[in-house]
UniProtKB/Swiss-Prot annotation:
Its main location: membrane. It comes from Homo sapiens (Human). GO terms for molecular function: G protein-coupled ADP receptor activity; G protein-coupled receptor activity; G protein-coupled UDP receptor activity; G protein-coupled UTP receptor activity. Residues 1-27, 84-101, 166-194, 258-280 are extracellular. Glycans are attached at residue 5. The keyword Disulfide bond applies. Belongs to the G-protein coupled receptor 1 family. One of its GO terms (biological process) is cellular response to purine-containing compound. GO terms for cellular component: plasma membrane. The lineage of its organism: Eukaryota, Metazoa, Chordata, Craniata, Vertebrata. It comes from the Eukaryota. The keyword Cytoplasm does not apply. This is P2Y purinoceptor 6.
Length: 328
């Protein structure tokens, strides 16, 4: 990333002499984003289709999963623009509005996924640790939909400043789309970026870990022989805990650690350009991990939902039988 000095001077801020060499983005991001698009688009469409065709058996967890898949699908639809941008050497020809929209969709998907995974985890905790309590069963699916509306409103409110800070600029006689903000606004973006990390990641992550720690304690206390149904339920809860924790660790933790470090360094006066470039490379190098949640989420869905895992096999068997009959 390089800062056009004219941008800083137009804003009344001192110019910078740092020039980032980020050729690695042209090599790393297009193939990674292409893989995420190729896998995430059909997988999330399949999840949405399967849940929508099972509306009578729609549970609260399925409602949260449906909204999670919608968030992933919206992000996947924005990837072609980013693939073209980085394949052309970080050249953005799509205009300022598209730049702001793409950056907003990335962070909306990121923090929407975090919140919906937290909702799924909390629902699993209630189902295992308080299965007979009437207070968490009131409202049924309607309550789950209200929670989803609240999540979307919260995500939009949290991420809307991203669309305000993101902008296009001129570097080396080409138009670029800034990710966080133009470097001239680094100190202005810093408080918002840190608040977004705390509210949009750390607090939900802490809530999710608390849910699964309590759930693990409950499962460990259930000693002695159990019925097959109970054993299957415990196994499902354990699988969910491991997979969700892994999804968080792979997708979200490296990205937020490097992003926080980069925000702190680039907002500190007098930091050498080589240090700034190193932190920028570390942050942007973990961006594919954050994008991978669009693929990990539907895999998580199929891994933990046995009845939905059976459907693709049943459909494949029906198609195979149909082709065999036609071939006779």
């Amino acid at each position: 990333m390089e800062w056009d000095n004219g941008t800083g001077q137009a804003l009344g801020l001192p110019p910078t002499t740092c020039v980032y060499r980020e050729n690695f983005k042209q090599l790393l991001l297009p193939p990674v984003y292409s893989a995420v698009l190729a896998a995430g688009l059909p997988l999330n469409i399949c999840v949405i289709t399967q849940i929508c065709t099972s509306r009578r058996a729609l549970t609260r967890t399925a409602v949260y999963t449906l909204n999670l898949a919608l968030a992933d699908l919206l992000y996947a639809c924005s990837l072609p623009l980013l693939i073209y941008n980085y394949a052309q050497g970080d050249h953005w020809p799509f205009g300022d509005f598209a730049c702001r929209l793409v950056r907003f969709l990335f962070y909306a998907n990121l923090h929407g996924s975090i919140l919906f995974l937290t909702c799924i985890s909390f629902q699993r905790y209630l189902g295992i640790c308080h299965p007979l309590a009437p207070w968490h069963k009131r409202g049924g699916r309607r309550a789950a939909w209200l929670v989803c509306v609240a999540v979307w409103l919260a995500v939009t409110t949290q991420c809307l400043p991203t669309a305000i800070f993101a902008a296009t600029g001129i570097q080396r006689n080409r138009t670029v789309c800034y990710d966080l903000s133009p470097p001239a606004l680094a100190t202005h973006y810093m408080p918002y970026g840190m608040a977004l990390t705390v509210i949009g990641f750390l607090l939900p992550f802490a809530a999710l870990l608390a849910c699964y720690c309590l759930l693990a304690c409950r499962l460990c206390r259930q000693d002695g022989p159990a019925e097959p149904v109970a054993q299957e339920r415990r196994g499902k809860a354990a699988r969910m805990a491991v997979v969700v924790a892994a999804a968080f660790a792979i997708s979200f933790l490296p990205f937020h650690i490097t992003k926080t470090a980069y925000l702190a360094v680039r907002s500190t006066p007098g930091v050498p350009c080589t240090v700034l470039e190193a932190f920028a490379a570390a942050y942007k190098g973990t961006r594919p991990f954050a994008s991978a949640n669009s693929v990990l989420d539907p895999i998580l869905f199929y891994f933990t939902q046995k009845k939905f895992r059976r459907r693709p096999h049943e459909l494949l068997q029906k198609l195979t039988a149909k082709w065999q009959r036609q071939g006779r």
